[in-house]
Amino acid sequence: MAEKRELATFAGGCFWCMVKPFDEQPGILKVESGYTGGHTENPTYEEVCSNTTGHREAVQITFDPDVFPYEKLLELYWQQIDPTDSGGQFTDRGESYRTAIFYHNDKQRKLAEESKKKLGESGIFKDPIATDILEAGPFYPAEEYHQDYHKKHPERYTQYRIGSGREGFLQQHWGRKHDEQ
């Protein structure tokens, strides 16, 4: 039987930290770092970091929904971010680091809204959930040196996750390391 393919797009701050947790799951066919949500075509990393393009750093995931359904992607996504921070993620500040779920169809939109509501009512966070839910638009792959950063530079990747405060936050709120599911 042929595998199904769907897209999911998530902004979760620095895209380096958003690839590995998804990449290691069954049914995930591809995870690509890039830029989306803005008004500039084919932006560069420097342009996106200038906070003038409207784009956010994001990952676009190609997945088989029969193996790893969208609902599970949402659960894993929430466990990679601080969903209450509207100004960026951890040490990375500005619009390019703001969180968002970019839906590709009405079913994804509904599931994302339900998931956000459920998280807000869970009591895990005292502040309101600030993650945007937006319609997916063009996705521009990031430069090659940003792709699979955790594989190319494992030591720097680990240092960044810890140094940025992301790793400690995730352990505090979810009680396990980022890559344990």
Swiss-Prot record:
InterPro entries: Met_Sox_Rdtase_MsrA_dom (IPR002569), Met_Sox_Rdtase_MsrA_sf (IPR036509). The active site is at residue 14. It catalyses: L-methionyl-[protein] + [thioredoxin]-disulfide + H2O = L-methionyl-(S)-S-oxide-[protein] + [thioredoxin]-dithiol; [thioredoxin]-disulfide + L-methionine + H2O = L-methionine (S)-S-oxide + [thioredoxin]-dithiol. One of its GO terms (molecular function) is peptide-methionine (S)-S-oxide reductase activity. The keyword Oxidoreductase applies. The keyword Oxidoreductase applies. Has an important function as a repair enzyme for proteins that have been inactivated by oxidation. Catalyzes the reversible oxidation-reduction of methionine sulfoxide in proteins to methionine. Coiled coil: none annotated. The gene is msrA. NCBIfam families: msrA. This is Peptide methionine sulfoxide reductase MsrA. Keywords: Oxidoreductase. Its EC number is 1.8.4.11. Belongs to the MsrA Met sulfoxide reductase family. Pfam families: PMSR. It comes from the Bacteria.
